[in-house]
């Protein structure tokens, strides 16, 4: 595997931020330099991303976070996903759930997550933390090429410009033009001053209920909460891998790793290693199809799934000479998302992913607030046999997942993630193997050629299982691609950096030094203090 890089790793001792947008990185660093904690800086980064990357995440979206408290060697999973409105049920839809409009949304969970993080880590006031986001919304920021491309790309698929008018955007925006969002600034100021209640009990909640014709109720907003739980944790080599519990598909990442642990990946030829990992992915995705849903509504036996006997049985299905094109024997689309990480001078760190699901989510803005809603309700199934069947108050299965890695002594070793719908767990699988087995540094890892196995070329679905196309960046040697084809994979070449991920990665040395890497496939970077 080539280890040449476009960028150098970033080394720091007193704090680090890595994100997909430079202004968000600057906001996080600003909060750290003012004495804020990793949690404070993460909230600031999150809020700025909602302002400057609204197509990927917003106050009307969701968040999942894995945190590490260095002093207590404590890891937590924050599940900031929203529930279906109590008016939402399968009989409200014919053949599919609406993709746009308020009926495509779940209760937003991001703002609630901010305040749970602040409870756990907060040192500065929310006025101080949200000040950078309020400034960019009130006084404007210069549109970069990614911002302009995201708007034009959305308009090519959906010519209706109403969502952009509601956000206050000029659809003829050019790179360098100033983007001002006065209504969003007002909403952020209300949240900074009045706290969580401003969103879930106050004027914002009332405006959502009124504009949605009662689809959402005040009860839906008032009853929402971010769940704070122990993460799922499994041993891989000499490390503990921490992932998101259901309804996140973080369990699939852990299953992939457990299957792969039975093989010496470091000594494998690259074609064999890719083949093995793709086959492990197929098995794990088949399990997801049968098991993944909201654990508050269905039973999910993860102890059984992760048991050594279950993993051994799944591992035995892998033929190292031939791709499995049939359904694995298991027990009974592109997405718009943003990932970032933050660590502080005390060794505390957060791995954070937030999203409105598809590009610009529901394409519907709560009137008078500047807040864009998610379209995460489309993550449900209308099949009554599915564990992910839609129901009032239920959370849909989520592609969103964040992860961290600790050593046997409990200290943080790695943290990372990426957006990308079903690509997420596949990319994260590769990142962890590259770090632990292949010993790549974070920047080498972020830039390394990647693959993705999808149910169809360019496609992504929560029903995805085992069939599909293996897409590989064309920096991989031709002999490797040919070997994969000979094993039976349907291989398609992506451009050199054409994989749909935007990775941010952190390594923490035993002496506490931070090393961060940022993906050249996106416009962000890493910065330290």
Say what each PLM segment does:
Residues 242-250, 337-341, 353-364, 417-425, ...:
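Glycine-rich phosphate/pyrophosphate-binding beta-alpha loops
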Residues 264-356, 369, 376, 495:
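Internal maturation/activation junctions in enzymes
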Residues 1-26, 30, 36-248, 306, ...:
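Noncatalytic scaffold domains of N-terminal-nucleophile
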Residues 51-68, 72-76, 216-217, 348-414, ...:
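Active-site rim segments in enzyme catalytic domains, especially the processed small/beta chain
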Residues 346, 394, 428-429, 437-497:
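Extended C-terminal subregions enriched in glycine
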Residues 228, 334-337, 398-400:
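Short, small/polar residue-rich loop motifs at catalytic or cofactor-binding pockets
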Residues 57-58, 62-69, 338-342, 402-404, ...:
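Short beta-strand scaffold segments in enzyme catalytic cores
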């Amino acid at each position: 595997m080539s280890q040449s890089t476009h960028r150098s790793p970033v080394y720091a001792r007193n704090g680090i931020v890595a994100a997909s947008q430079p202004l968000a990185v600057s906001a996080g660093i600003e909060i750290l330099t003012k004495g804020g904690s990793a949690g404070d800086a993460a909230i600031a980064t999150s809020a700025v991303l909602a302002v400057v990357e609204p197509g990927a995440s917003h106050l009307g979206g969701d968040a999942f976070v894995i945190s590490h408290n260095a002093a207590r060697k404590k890891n937590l999973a924050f599940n900031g996903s929203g529930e279906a409105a109590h008016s939402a049920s399968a009989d409200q839809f014919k053949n599919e759930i609406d993709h746009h409009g308020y009926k495509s949304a779940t209760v937003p969970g991001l703002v609630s997550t901010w305040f749970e993080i602040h409870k756990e880590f907060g040192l500065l006031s929310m006025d101080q933390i949200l000040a950078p986001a309020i400034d960019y919304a009130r006084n404007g920021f210069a549109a970069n090429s990614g911002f302009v491309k995201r708007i034009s790309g959305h308009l090519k698929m959906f010519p209706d410009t109403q969502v952009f008018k509601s956000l206050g955007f000029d659809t003829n925006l050019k790179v360098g033009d100033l983007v001002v969002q006065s209504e969003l600034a007002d909403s952020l100021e209300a949240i900074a001053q009045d706290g969580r209640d401003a969103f879930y009990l106050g004027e914002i909640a009332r405006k959502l209920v009124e504009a949605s014709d009662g689809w959402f109720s005040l009860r839906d907003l008032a009853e929402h909460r971010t769940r704070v739980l122990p993460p799922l944790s499994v041993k891989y080599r000499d490390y503990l891998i921490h992932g998101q519990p259901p309804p996140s598909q973080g369990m699939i990442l852990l299953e992939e790793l457990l299957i792969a642990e039975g093989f010496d990946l470091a000594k494998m030829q690259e074609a064999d290693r890719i083949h093995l990992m793709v086959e492990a992915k197929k098995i794990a995705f088949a399990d997801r199809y049968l098991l993944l849903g909201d654990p508050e509504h269905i039973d999910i036996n993860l102890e059984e799934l992760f048991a050594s006997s279950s993993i051994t049985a799944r591992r035995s299905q892998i033929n190292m000479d031939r791709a499995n094109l049939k359904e694995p024997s298991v027990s009974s689309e592109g997405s718009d998302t943003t990932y970032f990480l933050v660590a502080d001078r005390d060794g505390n760190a957060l791995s954070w992913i937030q999203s409105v699901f598809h590009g610009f989510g529901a394409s519907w803005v709560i009137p008078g607030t500047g807040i864009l809603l998610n379209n995460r309700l489309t993550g449900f199934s209308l099949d009554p046999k599915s564990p992910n069947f839609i129901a009032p108050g239920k959370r849909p299965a989520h592609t969103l997942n964040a992860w961290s890695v600790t050593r046997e002594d409990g200290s943080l070793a790695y943290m990372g993630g990426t957006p990308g719908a079903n690509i997420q767990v596949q990319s994260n699988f590769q990142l962890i193997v590259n770090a632990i087995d292949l010993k790549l540094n974070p920047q080498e890892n972020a830039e390394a050629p990647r693959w993705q196995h999808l149910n169809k070329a360019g496609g992504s679905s929560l029903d995805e299982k085992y069939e599909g196309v293996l897409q590989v960046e064309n920096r991989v040697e031709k002999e490797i691609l040919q070997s994969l084809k000979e094993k039976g994979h349907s291989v398609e070449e992506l451009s050199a950096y054409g994989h749909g991920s935007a990775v941010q990665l952190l390594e923490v040395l035993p002496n506490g030094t931070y090393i961060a890497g940022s993906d050249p496939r996106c416009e962000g970077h890493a910065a330290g203090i």
